[in-house]
């Protein structure tokens, strides 16, 4: 019918719609429109042409034609019929019904013809008809959508294809790379040492060169034949602590402890100013800290010594010699000192007389059995140079390794259980005790390591992301399913779309489905995030949600909300459900308002901000509170979420023999966000009864109802509505393997990966839709007795619950719908997984987590013990260094000690990354134990105390510390006090052994004790000043005085000005109460005059409230013949005997004719010279023996691949 005429001129009708200045606009709204109906009617009326003469397409495409319905929608017409009508629209009519045939026809833009399907313009009808015939023809293989949409689909597929090229397509290569990196992260537990097991080197402190030999004949003979003495022959000899001097280790621990002899030239290397200096093993300044770190210094040094000695004693070759088996050394010096009793010298000197007492059967191997049942024996017992302190440390370390040992039968069971019975393994050889596989760890050790992991990662996303990427790489490497976006494109292409609405529903869908980055692994990252739900939170990124300013009529907003709703259950975000709900509530803010009780928040607040239980809308928490009549869609959505949100499942993984790191879950269990079913062993296929399928079906059903609702249908038009519902229905009908994969296959992959990752899974319980059960915090708190120095600290340390890691919803949505399919037509799950995961069990990376956990536990116990000995807080730990004066250590000092121990353990065991340093990064490291807990919204707290297991290295550290206390001279530490008094003599002088020297003490006659401040009281009239004693009375400086070292530290200036001159004059004697102190000794010739005054004055100048230098002592060099001596003046000597560090004097002579005379201590050599010695007896910790029997091991360390037989593996 002709249109109703309007009295409007065509030239006065505007072609551009200008919205009001305050109108809401959007970038997707096109404000430029075609000529209006009024302009078309005016043109038709002015030309006197009826509508039938214009053809079915009207005048070009500038005005509506008969294909437009009364509602404004485009009438759906088959393309073939529409093309035919379009082709015949310009044919001349056979009968012209208009009487005015010659009237002038005024056509709007008659020179341009436009295609109705794609919008292409043509200058003639012939070109338009040919275009329609070639580009829009119908056929079995043709597309039913417009070329613009086809182009969008192809562009979308191409983008995903480019991303797929970045994915690891060769699973074996990806797995091998991860396995190699995991093995590299394993600590260096085993270092073989074929050298001597000793840390003390008997060396010449003062050489005998220049002294007259008593007997020269045989000495010349030895020098001519280059015979090497087994014992030192210097004028003064000391056993020097030098770890590794006789080692022939396979790999260095890089923690050699090398203390120089306590002489003036070498004392600086054993006196430390800072903990860093202790750790590095060299001096920054020759200063000792009795008031701050006398406990810490020896403790840290003992840790360094024990870490250096963690070797496996290896057996060397045993050639036959003099009827006994001894080992052969390439180094002839080492061979000489290894068996000091093997050759007895003919010269009657001090060393020869001692070696003449050695027993022949105490040299070399004990017994001769080298083979057992045709195989090399597991161990060999032998006598050789070996100090029992080093031997004890190594035996304790060997016990630690043996406690971690797994026999082949256990390894086979572990491999089968960890692989979920998918890897068939068997033992190809019989049991033997010659192998050592330190791969196990106890559950308490793994739990403590897990807490340390939490401290190291905390809420640091950069530290947590590599964990997710590593697990995702493993899952991608073993899964048989791959993303295939073409499945989705085929479904989209089957839906016809002839709408001209901008944006097009199909075009907008393909635009939104384009990846924004490297998202091919998004679904695998989300699955991997389930393994670490206590450390990280996988949440949908904010840009995936619809714009809250949009309405429900916005097609992009509808698609975004649908995508978010589908992907939400795949994340570990506890607020994912309410965020997905609010993505729709934002769009329905105007037609369906609901109550948002949170202050400052409304229904238009972006959905991503609803990330706390207190802001959850009550209508979502309880859908029955929503009015079905006023909010039908939101009520239906909340009800659907509560009905179909997936219930979590449980997965068994690992094996109890390996231990379990679970803290909040039962041992060897994993929580899974979806219900689980057993893996089918024969075949796979799509499933339509799983929780995921029901979720997908219910989500699409809801959004179809949204599109059909009055809010949308009355606005977008019937054609657009049918296109939207058609697309949703087509996507819902896609036969995807994803539901089957998530329910039956993915749990197996998660269980296998969770059992082999270096970082064990750390999970918290999954909370569903109850806001009161949402976990808001995961915290680590120190445990231990309260201390005054820690009262101001917080009792807990809180950490944000999980590090946030965003993920794109697009690949999740694709994977959930249809972009995952099986790679083979006939897939056998057992065969596929057996082949895919076998590379994981060909190396020892399976046990890397256990080995790192053991080392972390050992480091924590050692660091805790060192710090506790500096802080008397009541923590029950052995304190062998209690006799050393010690002030309470501050938190910064404890942090330095913690870092020193952490660095030493990482250096000794070649560990990269964090170990125990996380304890000191977020608070005071002075802790006894650690506990971990999570806090729910309702206030409920679940706490787990992670007490460390027994520590072998801590026991070794305690033994070393006890030896330091009992034999401090070996570490240049003297016991007792120092007496400053003038002693002028021509005779011998031995300040370390004060026999015959005057000693006075507190309570003696005429002995005064200085007051607490060392105050000097000047006297008038030229009288000498006086000193206030401890009773507050002034006393004359002359006489005997007792000075506590603490008083001297604060009054050393007065001491140097008034007391020290009186001591040099011989009128005053002072006893400085030290307890223990470092010392150095200067050996000099007895022929020249000497005075100690300059050295003592320098020592006094170095005293400060923060430290005391080593006390300088002097002694003449022992002489072979009686010398002519000069007058010498000495001032300082000890009050106790401190010659324990002197090995001998004048070893090449019969005895010392003049000077200090020390013989070889026979109680250090009972295994060599005592017939009544029982093998295995030790005098530790009272005394260090230098010669002992030891057991050398012939272990083999098979690889996992070499231990087990796995079919199909070469």
Swiss-Prot record:
SMART domains tied to this protein: ZnF_C2H2
Zinc in keyword set: yes
Entry keywords, A to Z: ATP-binding, Capsid protein, Helicase, Hydrolase, Inner capsid protein, Metal-binding, mRNA capping, mRNA processing, Nucleotide-binding, T=2 icosahedral capsid protein, Virion, Zinc, Zinc-finger
Gene Ontology molecular functions: ATP binding; hydrolase activity; RNA helicase activity; zinc ion binding
Gene3D superfamilies in the record: Inner capsid protein lambda-1
One Pfam family cited in the UniProt record for this chain: Lamba1_VP3
Region (Disordered): 1-28, 294-319
InterPro entries, per the entry: Lamba1_VP3, Lambda-1/VP3_sf, Znf_C2H2_type
The keyword Nucleotide-binding is assigned to this record: yes
Principal localisation: virion
An example Gene Ontology biological process: 7-methylguanosine mRNA capping
Record field: compositional bias (Low complexity): 299-315
A GO CC term assigned to this protein in UniProt: viral inner capsid
Zinc finger (C2H2-type) boundaries: 113-136
Family the UniProt entry places it in: Belongs to the turreted BTV-fold inner capsid family.
Subunit structure: Homodecamer; each decamer is made up of two conformers of VP2, called VP2A and VP2B. 12 homodecamers assemble to form an icosahedral capsid. Interacts with VP6.
Protein's UniProt name: Inner capsid protein VP3
Organism: Aquareovirus A (isolate Chum salmon/Japan/CSRV/1981)
Recorded name of the encoding gene: S3
